[in-house]
A protein has these predicted regions:
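Glycine-rich phosphate/pyrophosphate-binding loop regions near the starts of catalytic domains
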Residues: 26-30, 36-190
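N-terminal amphipathic/basic leader segments beginning at the initiator methionine
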Residues: 2-35, 39
Length: 190
């Protein structure tokens, strides 16, 4: 039996293109990090984990609020119209709105993009939209994952999910119980 060398390239994964994409993310993230974001390690992108220093945030009895979401079938619309920046913005909005309704101030955001094949320009549009959504929401993109999975996703298909974290004082949280007592809907836009 002859041994063959298994490589990412043979499996259909383009590490060089993925690295180029991470470099793009790091570049636009650093450029778009809010100057007041003294809590953020500005070199998070590309690391295996991301840090955010909450010890300097002046909130009494702080609670961390987290949310994760996706954009669902809007992905099909983005593919149909070949427009991908708006789903990046929408992804951030879906996650951040879930923080805001609980009274939390968004701190940071992470993304997950799964693709069959890395299409650099498409991914650039998506991530540029995510960064724009973070700017609108006054939070920072601090990390994420881009997974190239040939054979799992068709070459033009992808999935997108996000994760956001915010902070609120325990006394200022909007719980389901409080919202039910008010007997009116809550609507948040960013």
């Amino acid at each position: 039996m002859q041994k063959t060398k298994n490589t990412y390239k043979k499996s259909g994964v383009n590490i060089n293109l993925a690295d180029r994409f991470v470099e793009h993310i790091a570049k636009i993230s650093k450029k778009n990090v809010k100057k007041k974001s003294k809590y953020l390690n500005k070199d998070n992108i590309g690391a295996f984990g991301s840090t955010f220093d909450i010890s300097k945030i002046k909130i009494k009895d702080p609670l961390i609020v987290s949310s994760t979401d996706g954009v669902g079938t809007k992905i099909d619309l983005a593919n149909q119209f070949n427009k991908f920046d708006t789903i990046g913005i929408d992804l951030v909005a879906m996650c951040v709105n879930d923080l805001i309704v609980q009274g939390a101030k968004p701190l940071f955001f992470l993304d997950y993009i799964a693709v069959g094949k890395i299409k650099f320009n498409k991914l650039k549009q998506i991530i540029n939209g995510i960064v724009k959504g973070c700017n609108i929401s006054d939070c920072s993109l601090i990390g994420g994952e881009t997974a190239e999975m040939p054979g799992i996703y068709d070459n033009n298909k992808f999935d997108l999910a996000g994760f956001s974290v915010g902070i609120v004082s325990k006394k200022k949280t909007n719980t389901q119980k409080k919202c039910a007592k008010r007997r009116h809907g809550i609507s948040c836009t960013i």
